[in-house]
C-alpha cells in the first residue's frame, strides 16, 4: 500500500488516502484504502438509502468528494501500541476520541464495565457518539440479538468511521438504527417514539466544539421528554378513572353537542388575544379593555372571573379539566354571552351552565373515541393539543381557527414577585377563606411556590424569575410548537415570566398595532352565523341516529370491559402456574425425568399467555390499559421475579376492567 499523501485535509492516491495528513504531526497518519471506504459506503447505502443519499455517500464520486472535504481538524492516525499500525484512532481538534495506543482494547474494557452488565443494556443500547465505532461493533458482536441505536451528529466523524476499516459485519447486524447528521429534534423524536431511558443511554465524549450545542440541545430534549412522561404517568394515574366517569356522565351531551371542526380557519382575517391565568393578567386586562379595535378574545376558565370583573366578555371560554375544583373558576358566573369549547371528560357541572353555545373537541383520552364515534360532524380529527395546561390548548384553538397574530396575556409560567395567581383568583380567595392561625394564607402560598421543584429561569427582561418543573414543561411545549408552526406569529403581552423562544415580547404600544383587521361587529356576526349553521335543523334531526350509535358503542364497551376482566384474571393465573412449574428461578422440582415434562408444560402455558396478551392488546382493551393502567417505568422494582411482576400487572388490569364495567352498568 502506498504511503499517504500530505497535500490537504483528505488526500487520495490511486487506491489510498489519508485524512488530516497536512496538519502538525501528533502521530503517524493512517493510510486509507479507498476500496474499503467505497465498499462501506455501498453497505451503508444498501441498509440506509435515504441517509446515504442525504449525506452524499450513495455514489462513488460524491462519496469521494465527502472524504476529501473532511476538515484538517479530523485526523485518522495509526494506533501507537505495538502491532496496531493497521488499526486507526481518531483525533479531533488535537484531542483523541479513542485511546491513541489501542482503541480496540479500550472498547473491550468499557464493554465489561458495570454499565453493560444489565440485561436491559444487553438487549438494547443507545450510543450517543459513534467515533470509529469500536465500542458499538464489539457490542453487537457480543450481543448479536441486541438492538443498537447510534446517534452521531457529526457527519465528518461518520465518514472517518467508514474510512477506518471493513465494516461488513457491522452493517449486517439485524437490529441496527443509525441517526447521522440530523437535527437534535429529529433524533430526540425518534427515541421518544421508540422508547428510551437513561439506563440504556451511553454518552461518548464530545470533541468537536461545533457539535457541543447540538448534544446539549439533544440531551435537554431527552430530559424534557423524560419529565413529560413522568408527569403524564402521574396525571393518568390520578385522573384516568375520573376522565372515564365524567365521560359516562356526559354521554347525553355527546349526541347533541356540535364539534369544533366548524371553526377551522373561520377567523383567518382576525387577531386573537388569549387570556391565561397568570399573576400578570390583571394588568393586561386593562390594556385589552381600553382597546377599541376588533379581535377575538379567548379566555381560559381560570381567567374568567377576572375578565368579568374587568368588564370583558370573552368570545370563547376553554375548559378541559376533569376536577370539581376547576369548575369553581366559572361557578356562579354569567357565561351566557360566551361560547364554551370543551370535551366530554370535563367535570359535568361545567356543561350545565348557560352559554351562548357549546362545542366539543375530540377527547384527548383514547378510549373516549369509541364513544364519540366518527362522522358526526365531518371525519377530520378535531383534537386540540393538550400540553398539560389549558393555556396550551387555548393557543392551539387560536391556531385552529386561523387567527393571526396570536397575543398571549397573563402567560407567565412563573411566579413573578412570588405571586402564584392573579389578584382575586379563585385560588387566592379560597386560600384566604380557609386560612387559620395554624394554616395561614402565607403558608399556603409558600407551599404552592416550593412544592413543585422550584428553580430560577431566564425571564424576558434578561434577569431570572422563580418557576418550577411543571411550568417549564409548558414553556417547552410552547417553544417546540411555535417552531412547528412558524407561520403563527405569537406574542407575549408585557411578559413578566419565563422567556419562551419564538414568542416575542409585546408592549402596550405594540399591542395596539398588532390587533384589528376585523371589526367587532363582523366578528359577532360571523360567530353567530357559525353557531346557527352548526346547530342547524339537520344537525338536530340527526341526534336520534347518533344516540342509537352511542348506545351500541356503550353496549360494546361494557361487554369488552367484562371480557377484559376475565382475560386478565386468566392471564394472572397462568403467570402463577408458570412460576410454580419452574418458570421462575429456584422453583420447580428437581430431577432429570421431570425436566422434559416441565419444559413442555411451560411452553404450553406461555403459548396460552401469548394468546391472551393478543386479546388484551386489541382495540378498546388496549386503550383502557394504556390510560388506566399507565405505569412509570422508572418505578419498576427489578427485585420482583418477572412472573410475579406480570401477575401483579394482570391483577391491576383485572381490577381496572371490573371498575370500568361497573361505571358503565351504573350509567
Locate the predicted segments by residue.
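Non-catalytic helical/linker scaffolds that mediate oligomerization, partner binding
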Residues: 118-126, 149, 386, 391-395, ...
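Acidic/polar loop patches that form or flank catalytic/metal-binding clefts of enzymes
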Residues: 404-410, 416, 487-493
Amino acid at each position: 500500500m502506498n504511503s499517504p499523501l500530505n497535500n490537504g485535509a483528505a488526500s487520495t492516491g490511486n487506491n489510498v488516502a489519508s485524512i488530516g495528513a497536512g496538519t502538525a504531526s501528533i502521530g503517524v497518519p493512517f493510510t486509507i484504502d479507498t476500496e474499503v471506504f467505497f465498499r462501506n459506503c455501498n453497505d451503508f447505502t444498501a441498509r440506509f438509502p435515504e441517509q446515504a443519499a442525504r449525506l452524499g455517500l450513495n455514489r462513488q464520486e460524491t462519496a469521494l468528494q465527502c472524504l476529501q472535504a473532511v476538515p484538517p481538524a479530523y485526523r485518522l492516525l495509526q494506533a501507537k501500541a505495538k502491532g496496531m499500525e493497521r488499526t486507526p484512532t481518531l483525533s479531533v481538534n488535537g484531542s483523541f476520541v479513542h485511546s491513541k495506543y489501542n482503541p480496540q482494547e479500550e472498547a473491550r474494557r468499557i464493554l465489561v464495565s458495570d454499565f453493560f452488565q444489565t440485561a436491559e443494556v444487553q438487549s438494547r443500547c443507545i450510543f450517543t457518539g459513534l467515533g470509529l465505532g469500536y465500542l458499538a461493533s464489539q457490542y453487537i458482536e457480543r450481543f448479536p440479538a441486541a438492538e443498537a441505536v447510534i446517534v452521531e451528529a457529526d457527519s465528518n466523524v461518520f465518514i472517518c468511521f467508514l474510512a477506518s476499516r471493513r465494516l461488513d459485519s457491522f452493517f449486517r447486524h439485524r437490529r441496527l438504527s443509525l441517526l447521522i447528521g440530523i437535527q437534535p429534534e429529529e433524533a430526540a423524536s425518534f427515541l421518544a417514539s421508540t422508547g428510551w431511558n437513561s439506563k440504556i443511554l451511553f454518552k461518548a465524549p464530545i470533541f468537536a466544539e461545533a457539535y457541543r450545542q447540538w448534544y446539549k440541545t439533544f440531551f435537554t430534549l431527552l430530559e424534557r421528554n423524560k419529565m413529560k412522561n413522568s408527569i403524564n404517568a402521574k396525571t393518568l394515574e390520578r385522573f384516568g378513572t375520573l376522565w372515564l366517569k365524567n365521560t359516562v356522565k356526559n354521554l347525553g351531551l355527546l349526541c347533541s353537542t356540535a364539534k369544533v371542526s366548524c371553526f377551522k380557519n373561520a377567523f383567518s382575517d382576525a387577531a386573537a388575544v388569549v387570556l391565561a391565568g397568570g399573576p400578570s393578567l390583571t394588568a393586561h386586562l386593562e390594556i385589552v379593555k381600553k382597546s377599541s379595535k376588533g379581535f377575538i378574545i379567548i379566555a381560559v376558565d381560570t381567567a374568567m372571573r377576572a375578565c368579568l370583573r374587568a368588564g370583558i366578555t370573552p368570545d370563547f371560554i376553554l375548559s378541559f379539566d376533569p376536577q370539581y375544583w376547576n369548575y369553581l373558576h366559572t361557578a356562579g358566573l354569567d357565561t351566557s354571552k360566551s361560547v364554551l369549547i370543551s370535551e366530554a371528560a370535563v367535570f359535568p357541572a361545567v356543561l350545565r351552565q348557560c352559554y351562548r353555545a357549546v362545542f366539543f373537541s375530540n377527547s384527548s383520552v383514547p378510549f373516549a373515541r369509541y364513544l364519540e364515534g366518527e362522522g358526526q360532524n365531518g371525519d377530520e380529527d378535531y383534537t386540540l393539543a393538550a400540553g398539560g395546561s389549558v393555556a396550551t390548548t387555548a393557543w392551539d384553538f387560536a391556531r385552529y381557527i386561523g387567527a393571526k397574530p396570536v397575543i398571549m396575556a397573563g402567560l407567565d409560567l412563573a411566579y413573578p414577585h412570588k405571586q402564584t395567581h392573579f389578584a382575586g383568583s379563585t385560588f387566592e380567595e379560597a386560600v384566604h377563606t380557609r386560612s387559620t392561625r395554624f394554616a395561614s394564607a402565607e403558608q399556603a402560598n409558600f407551599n404552592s411556590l416550593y412544592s413543585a421543584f422550584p428553580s430560577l429561569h431566564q425571564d424576558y427582561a434578561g434577569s431570572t424569575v422563580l418557576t418550577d418543573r411543571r411550568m417549564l414543561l409548558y414553556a417547552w411545549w410552547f417553544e417546540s410548537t411555535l417552531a412547528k408552526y412558524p407561520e403563527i406569529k405569537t406574542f407575549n403581552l408585557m411578559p413578566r415570566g419565563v422567556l419562551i423562544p419564538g414568542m416575542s415580547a409585546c408592549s402596550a404600544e405594540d399591542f395596539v398595532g398588532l390587533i384589528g383587521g376585523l371589526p367587532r361587529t363582523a366578528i359577532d356576526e360571523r360567530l353567530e352565523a357559525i353557531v346557527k349553521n352548526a346547530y342547524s335543523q339537520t344537525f338536530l334531526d340527526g341526534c336520534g341516529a347518533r344516540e342509537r350509535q352511542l348506545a351500541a358503542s356503550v353496549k360494546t364497551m361494557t361487554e369488552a370491559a367484562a371480557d377484559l376482566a376475565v382475560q386478565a384474571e386468566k392471564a394472572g393465573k397462568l403467570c402463577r402456574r408458570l412460576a410454580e412449574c419452574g418458570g421462575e428461578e429456584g422453583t420447580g422440582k428437581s430431577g432429570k425425568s421431570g425436566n422434559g415434562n416441565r419444559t413442555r408444560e411451560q411452553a404450553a402455558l406461555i403459548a396460552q399467555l401469548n394468546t391472551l396478551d393478543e386479546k388484551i392488546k386489541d382495540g378498546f382493551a388496549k386503550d383502557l390499559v394504556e390510560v388506566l393502567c399507565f405505569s412509570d417505568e422508572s418505578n419498576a422494582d427489578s427485585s420482583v421475579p418477572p412472573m410475579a411482576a406480570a401477575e401483579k400487572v394482570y391483577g391491576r388490569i383485572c381490577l381496572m376492567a371490573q371498575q370500568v364495567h361497573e361505571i358503565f352498568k351504573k350509567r
